[in-house]
Amino acid sequence: GQFVVWITTWVLVIKGVIPLWAGFIISTISTMNAYLPSHAGQHGHLSGKHKHLNWINPLVGQISLIPLSQSHEVLRATHMKHHAHTNDPEKDPDYYHTHVDGWLQAAIEVNKQTGDGRLAKMVEELAEDDPKFAESMQKGGNVSMLFLIANMIAAVTFPLETLLLWWLPRKIATSYLGIVFSHEPHKQLP
């Protein structure tokens, strides 16, 4: 549902049915909800007890993440490591944006996760210790590359629309998710 709203917003803005500013608001709200279906898929909840429907988890999870330009496989693998090593500064991929001084710092840190190299180093070490994690990161990396290419094509074709319907909503939504789903639940924990 959320992805349909997001992609429909693009079509309506490009066709001139709704103004870009309205599309920005709709896209931002839609993108803020993009992680929830993926999270359910990461835990296998979308298929539930029906193992023959396990394919639904990554399919719905990945489609829902298109507005966030994220790989479901990467987020699944890192999220499982987060559960396995919650609050461990050496092994919890969420540690650097959960253990900060406040919500604003959480919003900033979650948007620059790979900027200072700490997360990349942690992921590299986790991959060395866990071949399945390394495989997931490789598969997800390919999806991430497709998103990079798609973002560049969109930016060249529809520059202002890409800025206000994809890039900025993604940054706002990532900040929101970092605050609400990472920082707030973990801020009082050791």
Where in the sequence are the language-model features?
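Non-catalytic, topology-defining segments of multipass membrane proteins
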Residues: 1-28, 33, 37, 62-168
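Short, function-defining helix-loop hinge/capping sites that tune catalysis or transport
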Residues: 10, 47-48, 91, 182
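Membrane-interface elements of multi-pass transporters and channels
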Residues: 15-16, 40-49, 82, 183-188
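Transmembrane alpha-helical segments that form the membrane-embedded catalytic/substrate-channel core
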Residues: 28-41, 71, 167-190
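Post-HEXXH active-site segment of zinc metalloproteases
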Residues: 47-66, 99
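Short, surface-exposed linear patches
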Residues: 58-59, 87-90, 97, 174-176, ...
